[in-house]
Each structure stands twice: as C-alpha cells, then as structure tokens.
Amino acid sequence: MAVYFVTGKLGSGKTLVSVGKIQDKIVAGCKIATNLDLRLQNLPQVGRFAKTPRVLRIPDKPSISDLLAIGRGNDSYDENKNGLLVLDECGTWFNTRSWNDKERQPIIDWFLHARKLGWDIIFLVQDLSIVDKQARSALAEHVVYCRRLDRITLPFVGTLYSLITGSKMPLPKLHVGVVKYGDSQLSPTVERWLYTGKNLYNAYDTKQAFSSNYDSGVYSYLTPYLSHGRYFKPLNLGQKMKLTKIYLKKFSRVLCLAIGFASAFTYSYITQPKPEVKKVVSQTYDFDKFTIDSSQRLNLSYRYVFKDSKGKLINSDDLQKQGYSLTYIDLCTVSIKKGNSNEIVKCN
C-alpha cells in the first residue's frame, strides 16, 4: 500500500498530477474514490466510450460513514490492483488541532488501516509543514513535490531572450512531481511523475471550491459511455466539410507558406541540370611491352605507374576505370586481367 502527500505552491499542478494518477489507475482497471469533480469523458486515455470505470465521488470533507461507504478498494492480495483514494484540501484535517480532535479520530484510524481495505491514498496539501508531525510520521510514506517547468527561467538563455524581446522565454507546460521516500526533502527520490497540462485540464474542475456543507453523500459517476458516448453521432459529410473549411481558414497562412516552400523546392529539384557523366573509353594495350616504372603500397591499397614501349606513363587507376582488374603480387610484379586475357607485368 502506498500513501502519498502531494505538495506544491498554488498552480504548481498538485491536482493535475493527481488526476494523471487517477487516469493511470482507471486504465489499469482499478477502483477510484475522490472528492474532486471529474469529467471522465475528457481523460485522454479513457475517452467517451469507456464502459468500465468505477469512480466514486465522496463529500468534500468526508466523514467516517462516507469512508466506510466506499467499501474495499481491492479484494485480492495483489497490491498492484489496489484502489486509489484521492483527497484534496487535506491541510485542514491534518493540522495539530484536527489531529487531536476526538471527532476526527475515527477518520484517522481508517486512514491508518486503509491498507487492509486495499486502498492507495493521495493527500493534497499546499505545504507539508501544516501537517501535524505525528500525522507525517504515521502516514507520509511518500512526499511528492510538484513543480511547473514553464515557470522556471533557463540560465543565460532565458536572460538573453528577455533582454531581446522584453518578455519571459516561453517553455512547455510540463508538470513534474518529484517523489521522495520519506517526509524530508533530503529523502531519496524514488520516481518522477511527468504530465503535460493541456490534455488533462478539461478532465476536472480547475475552479472547484471545497465546502464543509457539501449536501450530497457518496455516489458513483456514470461511465463515460452512459453519460456521453451513447449520444455521440458520427459526423456526416457536410459537417466534415464545414470543419475542414474552419481548420483551413484557421491555418491558411501557415498552409500557404508550407505550399510555397514545397512548390519552390519541387521546381528547383525538377529544373536542376543533371551532371554530365563522362564516359571512359576502354583502350587495348600491349602489356607485353609494359614495364612497372614505379609502385607504392599503403596497408591494403596499392598503386602502379606503367611505361609502354613509347615511354608513355599510364597509372593503375586509369586501367581500373577502363575495366581492367589488377592483382598485387609484389611491388615489382602485378597481374592485369580483363575478360579472358591475363598478363603479368614486371619492373624493368
């Protein structure tokens, strides 16, 4: 059983990374209970046609009866199949006053024994220091520190960009949760949770306000298929053409620029003059009257310069271009072959 305290400043992505873990658990077929307002159909890996998610919505500040109502998260002994309980705004529960409150004691006892009921738990708090020390010692198995990378300025490059443009260098909205094993920042890092913001923003209410006067009890979310998927109608041809026109109008400048570049590249490629290939004319030589004028060898490569009866110099490279095959014997002996002809040429 794993218990996580997810901490971070306002807007650092505490809820977002928790919704990301909810999505992972739903995909794995696990049970979910949370006090977050979710939109299951907008989870990218779940979609509007999912029929199997089991997600319970519990009150903003659940009582012991609410926690008992959600039952067991996992009936097997495989902890990988544990359900996930996600609770936001837990700072008011685990401060020193609430921890010693006798009315809250049954809830705290339930959290301490949640492992036996097959639940993993994620508590969201703005800062770990507001949690009672005894609560941290008893429950804070893992602490997750959330950061937003788009709020970080790159050394030197970011400063140079700001001086030139007068604005902060834009970075991708990547939310990172650094998971520590223990309640100290010096504790060892066991993993990192990485989630991009855009694909999860629509999956939960980012402006949800939590209240002690929540008027509903525990209830189950409808599966995305029942709430949205069964009402989905495929687009007809006219609707598809309309969407195509909208997207073409939206990206017309970029599209025209891309077409212009592609056309220019195609035209330059077609009209580019083809290089002339020089044809090497094969000649017939009287190798009986050839002698090796000079030769050299470097590792496995060799080169000869021959002299004919008239004193004309011919190198081995020219002979090979004309289709002659040269076989090295030694620096003063070489075999020249072409077709059925095979001649031995030596030094003078």
Swiss-Prot record:
Cellular component annotations (GO), alphabetically ordered: host cell membrane; membrane
Q: Which UniProt keywords apply?
A: ATP-binding, Formylation, Host membrane, Membrane, Nucleotide-binding, Transmembrane, Transmembrane helix, Viral extrusion, Viral release from host cell
List residues traversing the bilayer. 254-270
Query: By its UniProt entry, which InterPro entries does this protein fall under?
Result: P-loop_NTPase, Zot_N
What Gene3D superfamilies does the entry give?
Answer: P-loop containing nucleotide triphosphate hydrolases
Where does it primarily localize? host cell
Subcellular location as annotated: Host membrane
Tell me where on the tree of life, at the top rank, the source sits. Viruses
Q: How does it sit in the membrane?
A: Single-pass membrane protein
A GO molecular function held by the record: ATP binding
Q: Which one GO biological process term can you cite for this protein?
A: viral extrusion
Q: Where does ATP bind?
A: G8, K9, L10, G11, S12, G13, K14, T15
Q: What does this protein do?
A: Isoform G1P plays an essential role in phage assembly. It is required to increase the number of adhesion zones between the inner and outer membranes of the host cell. The extrusion of neo-synthesized phages occurs at these adhesion sites. May be involved with G4P in creating zone through which the phage assembled and extruded.
Subunit info?
A: Interacts with G4P; this interaction results in a complex that spans the inner an outer host membranes.
Family membership: Belongs to the inovirus G1P protein family.
Any idea what this protein is called? Gene 1 protein
